Regions:
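Amphipathic alpha-helical scaffolding segments comprising HEAT/armadillo-like alpha-solenoid repeats
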Residues: 97-110, 130-142, 163-173, 191-202, ...
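Leucine-rich solenoid repeat scaffolds
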Residues: 316-325, 332-340
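N-terminal signal-anchor transmembrane alpha helix of single-pass membrane proteins
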Residues: 1-39
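Short, Lys/Arg-enriched, disordered terminal segments
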Residues: 1-7, 328, 336-346
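Short inter-helical turns and helix N-cap capping residues of alpha-solenoid HEAT/ARM repeat scaffolds
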Residues: 113-114, 143-147, 174-178, 204-205, ...
């Protein structure tokens, strides 16, 4: 019994010692982090007027940072000013200063054991457009222990820097990459690089293909409207649906005969996107077809049809007629709902 009590006491003391050590570590770490942040803020106050004058007028001598806190303070300030005072001259001066003072520091940070430090370095390299570090970025991308987060950021940077191997890198991505990831990468490409992606559309995996179609609409890339129109004839419905969505984003006016094909599609998502395009381009000759779709069996299609009618020149009158005379209860309800919305915004 005594031995068990001693053993239990030893375990309690050991646990208390471990917990106390963790507590001390956290206290010391918090104080150290607090001291670091205060130091960075102090340097920011010193650098702020100098950096502002340098970026605004280009005739100020900026003292070189010598410590880690000075580097971070100057980089954060420079990044802030680039976002607030966005114009070509300021960005060019910021990149020149970053090339002069930050390259060695950021190169060292890319090899840091902590992920947060490495990611911050990548963000700063992107923001300052430090193409001189491209070889280090290539070497980093080839590392086996690279995290998915780092790989995503590197691909965005390769696209921004117009790296010639970005196509090969994108073909090697794994399933962890989402369509949203690919959208971010595509959004950083220039027109030439984006066009090359579109030209080789069917070489890419489905996620990249869908992201490409979406970005044509989101980025209003009118040069690729003809490509979207070819997809409208594709046998795979998802291509047609996304192409219609992109055309709706651009508000590109398809002819009525073409639109009727999609409005009569057996795929409800295709009818929905066709109606979304109708709502943007307001082709009055399609009113009767759209009125029929207010009776559609799918709620979202009925709702989009009612919105498309509301956007017509006499949309309120059309919806009032449906609300009063339609033989379909769901169509009457939908017309009343959009009538109320229309009158609120009238």
């Amino acid at each position: 019994m005594l031995n068990e009590l001693v053993f239990f006491t030893v375990i309690l003391i050991a646990l208390f010692t471990v917990l106390f050590a963790i507590f001390l570590y956290l206290v010391v770490r918090k104080r150290k982090d607090g001291k670091w942040k205060r130091e960075v803020e102090t340097y920011k106050q010193l650098y702020e007027p100098v950096l502002f004058r340098y970026l605004a007028y280009g005739d100020e001598q900026v003292p070189a940072p010598s410590s880690s806190a000075q580097h971070v303070a100057m980089m954060e300030l420079l990044d802030h000013f680039m976002r607030v005072l966005a114009n070509g001259g300021i960005k060019e001066r910021a990149t020149t200063l970053a090339e002069m003072y930050f390259v060695d520091y950021l190169r060292a940070q890319l090899a840091h054991r902590r992920l947060g430090r490495r990611m911050n370095a990548l963000f700063f390299i992107e923001d300052f457009y430090l193409c001189s570090l491209i070889h280090e970025l290539e070497a980093m991308y080839e590392q086996k222990q690279l995290t998915t987060m780092e790989k995503r950021q590197l691909l965005k940077m390769f696209a921004l820097f117009q790296h010639p191997h970005v196509y090969e890198y994108m073909k090697q991505t794994d399933e962890s990459f989402t369509q949203f990831d690919y959208r971010l990468i595509l959004s950083r490409m220039d027109d030439h690089m984006f066009t090359k992606m579109v030209d080789h559309f069917f070489d890419w995996n489905e996620k990249i293909q869908y992201a490409l179609i979406d970005m044509i609409g989101i980025m209003q890339k009118l040069a690729h409207v003809s490509f979207l129109r070819t997809l409208l004839r594709h046998e795979q419905s998802e291509y047609r649906i996304r192409a219609l969505k992109a055309l709706a984003e651009i508000a590109f006016p398809l002819d009525s005969a073409q639109l009727r094909i999609h409005l009569h599609s057996p795929v409800w998502q295709e009818r929905l996107m066709g109606l979304r395009l109708c709502a943007r381009i307001r082709q009055y000759e399609l009113v009767e077809t759209i009125k029929e779709l207010v009776k559609d069996r799918v709620f979202s299609v009925r709702s989009q049809a009612a919105e498309a009618l509301l956007r017509m020149p006499n949309g309120l009158a059309i919806l009032e007629q449906i609300a009063q005379t339609s033989d379909d209860r769901y169509a009457r309800d939908m017309a009343l709902e959009w009538l109320e919305r229309g009158r609120e915004n009238d």
